[in-house]
């Protein structure tokens, strides 16, 4: 089996255009900004709202790579990060109102372990597979 590409190799191929003040375009209509300071899901969403946005929602494989690569560019490591999705009344939905149409769950997920995992993280240690976690965890995040 061939070794998977390194984050540096993967991210070198992802072209991102700056739109100023640490914001980068994730596609032609949306820009994103990474925040390293870990916050709970609600604290992170509140911060994004103060930036006139929401936690980032991912809709395509390319957007997942852009989000992962921003993490890599800022930290030179991949880690877990809040995304703008959560569970309400048993349904997973994006908090910006867009369709939850990109669901690359890690194996065995979502599992709602302990009955209290209502928020969604992208685990970029596993190249962006989604996992449901408790909303009280503190993670870095990205606003869009």
Swiss-Prot record:
Belongs to the true venom lectin family. This is C-type isolectin Sp-CL4. Glycosylated with a carbohydrate of 383 Da. InterPro entries: C-type_lectin-like (IPR001304), C-type_lectin-like/link_sf (IPR016186), C-type_lectin/snaclec_domain (IPR050111), C-type_lectin_CS (IPR018378), CTDL_fold (IPR016187). The role of this hemagglutinin in the venom is unknown, because it is masked by the high venom hemolytic activity. Lectin with specificity to galactose. Induces hemagglutination. It comes from the Eukaryota. Gene3D superfamilies: Mannose-Binding Protein A, subunit A (3.10.100.10). It comes from Scorpaena plumieri (Spotted scorpionfish). GO terms for molecular function: carbohydrate binding. The keyword Secreted applies.
């Amino acid at each position: 089996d061939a070794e998977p590409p390194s984050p540096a190799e993967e991210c070198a191929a992802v072209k991102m255009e700056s739109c100023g003040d640490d914001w980068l375009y994730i596609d032609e209509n949306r820009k994103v900004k990474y925040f390293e300071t870990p916050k709970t899901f609600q604290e992170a969403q509140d911060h994004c709202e103060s930036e006139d946005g929401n936690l980032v929602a991912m809709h395509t494989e390319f957007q997942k790579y852009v989000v992962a690569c921003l993490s890599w560019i800022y930290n030179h490591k991949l880690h877990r990060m809040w995304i703008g999705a959560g569970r309400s009344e048993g349904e997973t939905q994006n908090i910006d109102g867009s369709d939850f149409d990109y669901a690359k769950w890690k194996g065995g997920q979502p599992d709602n372990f302990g009955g209290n995992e209502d928020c969604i993280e992208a685990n970029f240690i596993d190249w962006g597979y989604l996992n449901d976690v408790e909303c009280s965890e503190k993670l870095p995040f990205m606003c869009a």
